Amino acid sequence: MLHVEMLTLVFLVLWMCVFSQDPGSKAVADRYAVYWNSSNPRFQRGDYHIDVCINDYLDVFCPHYEDSVPEDKTERYVLYMVNFDGYSACDHTSKGFKRWECNRPHSPNGPLKFSEKFQLFTPFSLGFEFRPGREYFYISSAIPDNGRRSCLKLKVFVRPTNSCMKTIGVHDRVFDVNDKVENSLEPADDTVHESAEPSRGENAAQTPRIPSRLLAILLFLLAMLLTL
């Protein structure tokens, strides 16, 4: 009898976990590949932007060269996350923080890749939490600067939850620099420009809350088992 009730408990827990998920979440995450170098035509236009959903990924690929290319001909960058003003002026000094550093152009293992997951919650004190309906901004500065003012910048719009359709599958979909050139979803007038600050304090330790129905069922079944 106890064995049957334990199986029932496990079944109910699994059922509640499945059906208590956010309806806007996706079974498959999209990955957006961005090649961070000055020869990328989308950076040259100055309006490079992508639209993502919560739980999607941004994969940034650093410049990479053959060994025959001299050091002074390679590109190196420090990438920053900034606010809207920093994005507009391409200035990370006023309001921004360092995200990644592309400093190994001759890496023997291929180009350096950095990934950003657009998640609502992060367990890391220096991680970043993203919100649907808001814009986020990345810029870079060259290493060394040498007085050059070339500005590479990227704008990311996190779509509202209701515009992210559920997807069924088992593999991530990958979009490279030539995919999704036309972006049909432009931010609405009420789009919020998110301030570039890493999550700290209370927000850094947040995790999705357990649904109250699930907690009540677990407590009820636990009480039943204790009375046996």
UniProtKB/Swiss-Prot annotation:
Its main location: membrane. It is found in: Cell membrane; Membrane, Caveola. Residues 190-200 have a biased composition (Basic and acidic residues). Disulfide bonds join 62-102, 90-151. Pfam families: Ephrin. Glycans are attached at residue 37. A lipid is attached at residue 203 (GPI-anchor amidated asparagine). Residues 1-20 form the signal peptide. Residues 29-162 form the Ephrin RBD domain. One of its GO terms (cellular component) is GABA-ergic synapse. PANTHER family: EPHRIN (PTHR11304), EPHRIN-A5 (PTHR11304:SF33). Binds to EPHB2. Interacts with EPHA8; activates EPHA8. Binds to the receptor tyrosine kinases EPHA2, EPHA3 and EPHB1. Forms a ternary EFNA5-EPHA3-ADAM10 complex mediating EFNA5 extracellular domain shedding by ADAM10 which regulates the EFNA5-EPHA3 complex internalization and function. This is Ephrin-A5. It comes from Homo sapiens. The gene is EFNA5.
